[in-house]
Amino acid sequence: MSSKEQKTPEGQAPEEIIMDQHEEVEAVEPNDSAEQVDPRDEKIANLEVQLAEAQTRERDTVLRIKAEMENLRRRTEQDIEKAHKFALEKFVNELLPVIDSLDRALEVADKANPDMAAMVEGIELTLKSMLDVVRKFGVEVIAETNVPMDPNVHQAIAMVESEEVPAGNVLGIMQKGYTLNGRTIRAAMVTVAKAK
């Protein structure tokens, strides 16, 4: 028997064993190289993760800033609207005593006296003109009776027993109240009905 023909105990020729082992080594080598990651690839992967995190943070920051700007714009619009609505408040507060004086003049005027008729008519027209002007700018008079007492627009001065007006309702107006665009600038001083 030649050396090529020599058989190993397993029944294989030595060349066959060497070839089998060589194939196994070749099969193992690609696996080893796959396990060894190129450091550049690892660095690229880390940088991609960092980039994604930075983009997420920037997106969140941009959204937060947009929301803050929208809130600021809305608050500014509301402030401007309130400034327009209530810019006249001080001026109206100065006019209220004049309107009250005209009201009192009409209350005490002798309307039966023909000599006073022209003066009473002049006061009535002046008061009407004044109220028309302030109504144009959002001022409303609070002077209704027989309505439920509302602490937002009424200030109770006294409680008076009454059979005609339900308890808790406004019985009489001592001094008119006024609102400016829905905001009470002076509460009406009222008497409130109570049950007997």
Swiss-Prot record:
CDD domains: GrpE (cd00446). The keyword Membrane does not apply. GO terms for cellular component: cytosol. Keywords: Chaperone, Cytoplasm, Stress response. The keyword Cytoplasm applies. GO terms for molecular function: adenyl-nucleotide exchange factor activity; protein homodimerization activity; protein-folding chaperone binding; unfolded protein binding. GO terms for biological process: protein folding. It is found in: Cytoplasm. Residues 1-40 are annotated as: Disordered. It holds the Pfam family GrpE. Participates actively in the response to hyperosmotic and heat shock by preventing the aggregation of stress-denatured proteins, in association with DnaK and GrpE. It is the nucleotide exchange factor for DnaK and may function as a thermosensor. Unfolded proteins bind initially to DnaJ; upon interaction with the DnaJ-bound protein, DnaK hydrolyzes its bound ATP, resulting in the formation of a stable complex. GrpE releases ADP from DnaK; ATP binding to DnaK triggers the release of the substrate protein, thus completing the reaction cycle. Belongs to the GrpE family. Homodimer. This is Protein GrpE. It comes from Salmonella gallinarum (strain 287/91 / NCTC 13346).
